[in-house]
Amino acid sequence: MTAITDLGLAGLRDGFRAGDFSAREIADAFNGAVAGAKALNAFIIETPDHATAAAEAADRARAAGELLPLSGVPLGIKDLFCTAGHQTTAASHMLGGFTPTYESTVTGKLFAAGAGMLGKLNLDQFAMGSSNETSAYGNVVSPWRRNDGGNAPLAPGGSSGGSSSAIAARIVPAATGTDTGGSIRQPAAFTGIAGIKPTYGRCSRFGIVAFASSLDQAGAMAQDVRDSAILLEAMSGFDPKDSTSLDVAVPKWEANLSSDLKGKKVGIPKEYRVDNMPAEIDALWRQGIEWLRDAGAEIVDVSLPHTRYALPTYYIIAPAEASSNLARYDGVRYGLRDLPEGANLQEMYAATRAAGFGPEVKRRILIGTYVLSAGYYDAYYTKAQKVRALIARDFEEAFRQVDVLLTPTAPSAAFALGEKSADPLEMYLNDVFTVPASLAGVPAMSVPAGLDGQGLPLGLQIIGRPLDEQGVLNAGLAIEQRAGFTAKPQNWWAK
């Protein structure tokens, strides 16, 4: 019999509805798994009482015949989402002790759908990072290990590294993530799970701690494509409290899942064939093309000519918006306050921000402040916005020819913790395949598709038209079914 904690979101939901187990049994199993996996450092806080209370409510609802869409399912919540009555830190000392009095729209929707919360998941500080090494609460460790006998702890990706590590380790069935330049998709690829960033505006940003407001988007992370569709459906919807929220109906993504791609065209962007791409990544990409052809799709070569400018464009726009968003953290209203004896207001601001922000956050604030300064605004920020428009236009042109695009998700498998942290530019290059879709605001998903020579997961990315999450999910399902990815990390972390 399959252990409860090995079941994904759909398996738990359907098994609970069929009476195979109670919601309380589900909650107890996952609460125990979370408590026994401290070595992963995936959680900043654990909330077993929340998961248990939601489970007991689900059991009562089942007895009364009043089940909700996610009744019986406990989730992990990235600690970037405000949760009423539960600490929200964005993995930064700057928000130490901050307990929101309100609920983010996304978590409010999930809890209203019957889900419980197992805890708040670790992340890169203020979602800035690609390895989950910038958290003030310590590195998250991937549950995966190389098969060459080396025991170097591996990065789970970032910024949603707590989410990816916890799902891959089967200590949560699914989790929320956020994606600004790849923070759902790259961790998903590193840990052998599925993750989808929907169209910008599909999920409300209200109550999500802001990094770069024109790029930030909540999304779903789970074991597979179906689970991702279920979770994203529950998270999505118009919210008048978010001025960028899209007032469009939420489709029935799970009900309309289909791996039959007959009549669909899949684009292969030539600019993604970058120099020094590892042979294993290139081979998997070629295999993915054959899988989609086998599913009935026509393969078409396309061009996204401004792709090579995407990374520098992103690392101008995102820090610029971050420097503005993070100006609010000054020690006056909430969070950390560092008040040296005899200090005036300006000195308190300086001391608080110096103590509260980590090195990577400070680096991005400085970059952002520089490109927004009077002498450089037009040379950097204005020019980057123009290039962003060109990148979006490239996608528009491509989607006149094809329905979805297929690319690698990341330029490598997971790297060791500490391997790239000394060189910020090398770390930023991890986003090379994910950033373009973020700049264009289009939906994109990573699906686990194979293992490298050291036994580590590799992902393929599907990018779709605006609001065509269904097309992305369906292409992802076609790859998932043909890849047959069932690999799991060997359990070394449980007590």
Swiss-Prot record:
GO terms for cellular component: glutamyl-tRNA(Gln) amidotransferase complex. Pfam families: Amidase. It catalyses: L-glutamyl-tRNA(Gln) + L-glutamine + ATP + H2O = L-glutaminyl-tRNA(Gln) + L-glutamate + ADP + phosphate + H(+). It is an enzyme of class 6 (ligase). GO terms for biological process: translation. SUPFAM superfamilies: Amidase signature (AS) enzymes (SSF75304). The active site is at 78 (charge relay system), 159 (charge relay system), 183 (acyl-ester intermediate). Its EC number is 6.3.5.7. InterPro entries: Amidase (IPR000120), Amidase_CS (IPR020556), Amidase_dom (IPR023631), AS_sf (IPR036928), GatA (IPR004412). GO terms for molecular function: ATP binding; glutaminyl-tRNA synthase (glutamine-hydrolyzing) activity. Keywords: ATP-binding, Ligase, Nucleotide-binding, Protein biosynthesis. PROSITE patterns: AMIDASES (PS00571). Heterotrimer of A, B and C subunits. Allows the formation of correctly charged Gln-tRNA(Gln) through the transamidation of misacylated Glu-tRNA(Gln) in organisms which lack glutaminyl-tRNA synthetase. The reaction takes place in the presence of glutamine and ATP through an activated gamma-phospho-Glu-tRNA(Gln). Belongs to the amidase family. GatA subfamily. HAMAP family: GatA. This is Glutamyl-tRNA(Gln) amidotransferase subunit A. The gene is gatA.
